[in-house]
């Protein structure tokens, strides 16, 4: 079967022009190659956004060295940037359990192992924030979802803060993102403020204590602070237990964790 370039989500400026687009609503950056198949999460989310009327492009495996031309080639989106490390956790994908670099990457052309950096969620977001500081960046994928609170990093053998702190992203869409990314796009398209977006389920974000939506509530789960977890292993274990328990509830409770002078807030998941 013959396919045209316009049958796929655009990855270059030329492909956008073939569709008659002079502006994009959302630009997705992925640590994987772009394959229009359900095995590749960025492709799924791109197609879902497209089906909801948004102009979407994907930048697969951008070059993070040099002049960052891959991050500039499509310009700034109207709504936001989406960043995903790929279908697998990038560190598991790049390294063995003995911390030796793998010789192949199953999600890259020709199985090349040098097509993504360590922690692409952090690297890509820091570059985007340097180039477009006023454009919101939403993290997604397994890498961000598993690092949405203080977490033990096996590769560096240390307890690290939520990935929002290291990356500088505005929020995390954790878990399965098909529903939340459309709601996020709709919210930005309607001109909603970041405070209003913070009320959405499956969104993790940082804010000052005075800016926590609705303030502290009786049914909130207050996690041990990051600073406390650095000296209290049981506190970290309790945090992870709460995270796992709430992730499997039909009606989850909001979780809040203090990190330095800010608070990480994780609203509830969607009700089924």
Task: Say what each PLM segment does.
Residues 25, 55, 136:
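Residues at the starts of beta-strands that form the adenosine-phosphate
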Residues 14, 28-32:
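Long, low-complexity, serine/threonine- and charged-residue-rich intrinsically disordered N-terminal tails
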Residues 20-26:
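A short, charged/proline- and glycine-enriched loop
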Residues 1-20:
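Short N-terminal or domain-adjacent regulatory/targeting segments
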Residues 33, 41, 60-264:
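Glycine-rich beta-alpha loop elements in corrinoid/cobalamin-binding modules
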Residues 263, 268-272:
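Single conserved hydrophobic/aromatic residue that forms the stacking wall/gate
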Residues 44-56:
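Short helix-loop-beta junction
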């Amino acid at each position: 079967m013959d396919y045209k370039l316009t049958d796929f989500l655009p990855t270059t400026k030329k492909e956008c022009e073939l569709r008659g687009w002079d502006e994009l609503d959302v630009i997705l950056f992925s640590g994987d190659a772009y394959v229009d198949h359900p095995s590749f999460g960025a492709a799924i989310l791109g197609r879902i956004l497209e089906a909801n009327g948004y102009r979407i492009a994907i930048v697969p495996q951008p070059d993070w060295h040099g002049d960052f031309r891959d991050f500039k080639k499509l310009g700034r989106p109207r709504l936001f940037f989406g960043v995903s490390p790929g279908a697998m956790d990038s560190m598991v994908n790049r390294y063995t359990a003995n911390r030796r670099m793998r010789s192949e990457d199953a999600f890259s052309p020709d199985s090349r192992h040098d097509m993504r950096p360590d922690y692409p969620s952090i690297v890509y977001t820091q570059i985007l924030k340097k180039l477009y500081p006023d454009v919101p960046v939403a993290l997604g994928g397994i890498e961000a979802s598993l690092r949405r609170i203080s977490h033990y990093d096996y590769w560096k053998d240390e307890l690290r803060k939520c990935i929002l702190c290291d990356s500088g992203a505005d929020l995390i869409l954790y878990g399965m993102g098909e529903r939340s990314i459309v709601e996020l796009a709709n919210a930005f398209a309607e001109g909603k403020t970041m405070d209003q977006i913070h009320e959405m389920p499956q969104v993790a974000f940082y804010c000052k204590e005075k800016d926590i939506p609705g303030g502290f509530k009786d049914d909130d789960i207050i996690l041990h602070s990051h600073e406390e977890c650095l000296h209290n292993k049981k506190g970290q274990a309790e945090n992870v237990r709460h995270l796992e328990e709430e992730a499997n509830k039909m009606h989850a409770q909001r979780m809040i964790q203090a990190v330095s002078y800010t608070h990480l807030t994780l609203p509830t998941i969607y009700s089924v």
